[in-house]
Amino acid sequence: MSIGILGKKLGMSQFFDEQGRAVPVTLIEAGPCRITQLKSSDTDGYAAVQIGFGDTREKLINKPAKGHLNKTGETLLRHLREYRVDGLDGFELGGSITVGDFEAGQKVDVSGDTIGRGFSGYQKRHGFSRGPMTHGSKNHREPGSIGPGTTPGRIYPGKRMAGRYGGKKITTRGLTILKVDSERNLLVVKGSVPGKPGALLNIRPALRVGAKPAKGGQ
């Protein structure tokens, strides 16, 4: 049973299917993730499993975190995530979540931070058309009008303007696992996922699986 796993994006490649077609894929180094805490309905009000992933230096972990991780015998975990479950059967404190809990053909949702591009202009951030490049034009990459004048005398909230681009957490849903390599802790996922190589990813079983129902259908 797969509840979710943390991993690191390695990069993109291509995978050839049975028909010989090249399919773009993302390679993810996922787990093994140590189970660091079990929450039950009796003590916490809900059932959940907390896992840890990634190595770090000892001086970067404070004393409360060390005390929390000492219960599992592992003190140098960088990232902690929690997954809600219906019951705690099959989970043990100090156990591991591995890619073996997933299977080829399974649909997953992958969450991560998009690539940060810093302060960007209108064309790069929002895809605005640029102004004429001919002689006499002075608004090559300017935004143009950003609103009326005296009425309302202000810029409406949410107006698309230049600003920080990227660096936001998003979720790519319904990706298909093409291959599971338990020996090398690799997941081969069809398509692209957020972030650049080395970025932290949260892989969970897809919330929505199946074709979109037709209009008027059940």
Curated annotation (Swiss-Prot):
PROSITE patterns: RIBOSOMAL_L3 (PS00474)
Gene Ontology molecular function: rRNA binding; structural constituent of ribosome
Gene3D superfamilies hit by this protein: 3.30.160.810, Translation factors
Gene Ontology CC: cytosolic large ribosomal subunit
GO terms of biological process kind: translation
Keywords: Ribonucleoprotein, Ribosomal protein, RNA-binding, rRNA-binding
Disordered as annotated region, ranges: 121-163
InterPro entries reported in the protein's UniProt record: Ribosomal_uL3, Ribosomal_uL3_bac/org-type, Ribosomal_uL3_CS, Transl_B-barrel_sf
HAMAP family in the cross-refs: Ribosomal_uL3_B
Listed PANTHER family: 50S RIBOSOMAL PROTEIN L3, LARGE RIBOSOMAL SUBUNIT PROTEIN UL3C
Protein role: One of the primary rRNA binding proteins, it binds directly near the 3'-end of the 23S rRNA, where it nucleates assembly of the 50S subunit.
Family of the protein in this entry: Belongs to the universal ribosomal protein uL3 family.
Subunit structure: Part of the 50S ribosomal subunit. Forms a cluster with proteins L14 and L19.
Protein name: Large ribosomal subunit protein uL3
Species of the source: Parasynechococcus marenigrum (strain WH8102)
